[in-house]
Regions:
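A contiguous loop/helix-start segment that scaffolds small-molecule binding in enzyme catalytic cores
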Residues: 10-14, 78, 149-220
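Short, charged/polar "capping" segments at the starts of alpha-helices
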Residues: 45-50, 137-138, 164-165, 191-193
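A short acidic, often aromatic-flanked loop/helix-cap motif at beta-alpha or helix-coil junctions
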Residues: 62-68, 112-113, 135-138, 189-192
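Class I SAM-dependent methyltransferase SAM-binding "motif I" and its flanking Rossmann-like core
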Residues: 87-152, 206, 210
Length: 220
């Protein structure tokens, strides 16, 4: 909480809720969420806390409306819930452009990238991490993903149904990338979690549909 003259203004708490499974939510995050008066987040993040009888606001494409809502509720305890960790491709950067650092508190969470590398039993300090969410995916494949895969021993991609692993693998193969392994973590930490390992050449033939996944591309 910060003080402005005689007013006391609550900090906006930006909280990483982890990959989605409740067992992967940090206790410090759980405590902050329970103490909050208002929860703000995407549908998937808010659904984790349906049992909490609190005011909830969904983050949609109109981000300026969310910023206005936060400004209107500066005197309340507001928790902004983001998937994974706030420091990795989240709503945090947008908030920092519209609010001062002193108005924001960040509570970390486990990223699905961390979970994917744990499932693969690999370290990831040398990995290149790229998000395809909300990007021009075809352009990203050509200009960012392909060079990274060619140059780096480990690449992690955050992707979804619009750019499934099969399509990524087919594109890379067409660019002459072949001697790589793809590991696909789908719905990580949820009961329906799947983790698939295949050569890049095998992936386009996979019949599974992947909904919300992390793709690791490593040397064979």
């Amino acid at each position: 909480m910060t003080e402005l003259g005689c007013f006391r203004v609550e900090k906006i708490k930006v909280i990483g809720v982890g990959p989605g499974g409740k067992d992967y939510l940090l206790p410090v995050a759980q405590k902050a969420i329970e103490e909050a008066e208002i929860l703000v987040g995407g549908h998937r993040a808010l659904a984790l806390f349906n049992q909490l009888k609190k005011e909830k606001r969904v983050i949609d494409a109109r981000l300026e409306n969310v910023a206005a809502f936060l400004n209107q509720n500066k005197g309340k305890k507001v928790a902004v819930l983001v998937s994974g960790d706030p420091g990795l491709y989240s709503f945090l950067d947008y908030l920092l452009k519209h609010f001062g650092e002193e108005e924001i508190e960040v509570i970390p969470g486990l990223s699905p990238v961390q979970v994917a590398f744990a499932r693969a039993r690999m370290s990831w300090q040398d990995a290149v991490i790229i998000s395809l969410h909300g990007r021009e995916k075809e352009k990203m494949l050509a200009c960012v993903v392909t060079p990274a895969v060619k140059e780096s021993p480990k690449v992690a991609l955050l992707t979804d149904q619009d750019m499934p692993p099969q399509k990524i693998a087919a594109y890379l193969l067409a660019q002459g990338v072949a001697q790589k392994i793809m590991l696909i973590g789908d719905n990580l930490s949820y009961p329906q979690e799947r983790f698939v390992r295949a050569s890049l050449a095998q992936v386009p033939q996979l019949k599974e549909q992947f909904d919300n996944c992390v793709v690791l591309i490593t040397n064979g």
